Amino acid sequence: MQRKYFFTSPPLKMPELPEVEEAMLRLRAAVEGRTIARVRTHHASHQRQLPAAAARRLRQQKIVRVERRGKHQLLHLENGSTLHAHFRMNGDWMMSRTDQPLEKFTRASIDLTDGTRIELHDSRALSSMKLHGKGENPLPKLGMEANDESLDADYLRDALSKRKGPIKPALMDQAVIAGLGNIYAAEALWRAKINPRAVSSSISRARLVKLAEAIHSVLDNETRAPGRYTDTENRDRFQVYDREGMACSRCGSKIRRIPQGGRSTYFCPICQRS
């Protein structure tokens, strides 16, 4: 069997809702209804997250359901426990066979009884894999899914009404909107013509209507055309992200980059004045 990433090689950078959704769907097709032979961890941080004793409890467990919540992937097992995975900055799944050697950056691996192996591949070792017992909630507090049709101006107004900080980091807070990250938050703000430094609670309802529409539009486009973003690929598919110094497609001004919350924010200083 030829080893293959679920996305691209090298792995995608900064997976957000569309990428994690596709990863979950491919993972579901590969493992749902199948039985785990063993789970191993191959990096110190992952060994702390999933100790050997916990990994042993996964043996001969049938994977009954795979789902996504925000950027989290959940493998629900026959005994009621849940294996919880998160890609963080640049994780990816890789499919191989149990008789093949592990890749250099494989941080955890799931061997199935049919000989299939799913590897959690992550060059920066920031990804995670944890086991949660029956009845335990594996998830942190999460807001509404970014692709939920109910996400509208009223939801955004309520979620942002007490926030005095800038809108861009607020949109990336998973307790506000689950699944939205740095790339698509920047793209949605550009479409809605909202300055990323605008105070969250001060944005008018009319702008929030535009913002909700922009979030749905950006994610719909990415879901329909899921080419994966890396440092050197697919830059032209974005309007502002990673386009510092390039011309805004709407007004021709140069895209700017500013630091916000330890991340780079890209925006048009003319289109996004408000």
Residue spans for each PLM region:
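Structured catalytic/nucleic-acid-binding cores of DNA maintenance enzymes
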Residues: 2-274
